[in-house]
Amino acid sequence: AYLGALHQAGLVVQEREGTSLRYRVAMDTTHDMMAALFSECCRGRVNLQFDCAPDPQNDGRPFNVLFLCVGNSARSIMAETLLRDMGGDRFRVYSAGVQPQSTLNPLALEVLRQKGHDTSALSSKHLSFFQAPEVPQMDFVFTVCDVAANEDCPAWAGQPVSGHWGLPDPVKAQGSVAERGLAFQATYGALRNRIAAFTALPLESLERAALQKAVDHIAENSKED
């Protein structure tokens, strides 16, 4: 009964040899099933699964990186801008939100401009935009708030390396404009430290497990920012 069920599911191949039936594992189908299973239950984290996930690309093209937060109006926008300017041609950088705002936070934009960043092309987007089949697969996905990290998102195509760089929401800061501006300055500084560490990694030469460990190490070392 069990072999029949496995055969019907395409996980074993049945072969007749004389009067006997022999079964062997259908490796391609089984591999695909295991990869999908661990992607769904472990979100592609290699320290929690078998080695089914491929290493991020190393074919010379830029790495695709996505930053996620709730509103995609401040933290993820800052992260997108920082990596784009600090990483240069090594990266194609994007950001999105699980509940994106219609406009970007003016204090976040002001801090970015004060630091010399061009903000003219920035916009808020829903994360579903980056899950469409025509959008390039991500190599890295970072959440910069706890809400986005806990969101029950569908598995990302290609099983990108993931990291959680959670930061307090500067939009919720109270006080005068100057006091609230300091919260955004602190967020900018914390993100800059993380991204400087990320861009210093030899991404092209590290295997997937080593990449995941390095990304997690950045998060752990940044908790005192």
Where are these regions (language model features)?
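Alpha-helix C-terminal capping/helix-to-coil transition sites in glycosyltransferase folds
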Residues: 136-137
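Short glycine-rich anion-binding loops that position phosphate/pyrophosphate groups of nucleotides
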Residues: 71-73, 146-149
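Beta-hairpin "wing" of winged helix-turn-helix
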Residues: 7-17, 24
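N-terminal helix-turn-helix DNA-binding core of bacterial DNA-binding proteins
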Residues: 21-29
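Amphipathic alpha-helical dimerization/coiled-coil segments
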Residues: 28-66
